[in-house]
Amino acid sequence: IYYQGSKGSYSESVLLEMFPDSELISCKTFQDVSINASNDGFGLLPIENSLVGTVIEAYESLIEYELEIFLEVKKKINHALIGLAGTQKQNLKKIISHPQALQQCSKYLNKLDVELQPVFDTAGGVLSLLNTKSEEIGAIAGEHFDNDERFTIIEKNISNHEENYTRFFLTGKTPPPIKEDKNLRSAILVAQDEPGSLLKALTVFDVLKLNLTKLESRPILGSPWEYKFYVDYQNSDTKIDQLLKDNLGQVAKEFKILGKYGSINL
């Protein structure tokens, strides 16, 4: 199973808890995860955070490499400010982390007089402190680093809100043997470029009594001012899925189901 980030990342922690016997392979980017998962095995992608929204790069890589969603995993995120052993908060001049983590802790960081530097993943940022050997640089990552004597947890619970969760998708080309009820759907919808087209498409969901849980517009690359929609809805009946596709085919330019899956809370 491929994941983005270094050892100690949130993605790795999800996989260690869910699939402890699987081979886990770290990748530098979300695109690398999707490329590898399209050829061999599976990929885990963080898709949405409850504080800052959709992880666009991850979602787009899933779509680009035509991966299927097999499972949703929701994990509570507990960000901490971390430094080398002995580092004190008042001595910090720079804090590094993944851009998502910096966003999720923006209220806390705005109170500090420090430089913020984005890096490619949370755990990698912490591990890079070992190379700097500086007590003027801190990193934001998971609280599980308190088990490593090389580092010190300067402050815990620094997210903008205590209820901070991330949705992860397990993706790939070939379905794994997963037992969870497949009662959730994710899809891409492209409405016709005419007045009322989105309303017509949404009316189809209403007529079929489907509960929409996500609707988010994104620009279509190469088509300025045209938009696609990320759509999540609840359904466990494949016959209803087919009715939905048939009816939307009459009023929308494109509709594609990206996955039929269940959900697990960690």
What are these model-predicted stretches?
Residues 1-266:
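Domain-level signature for soluble enzymes in the chorismate/prephenate branch of the shikimate pathway
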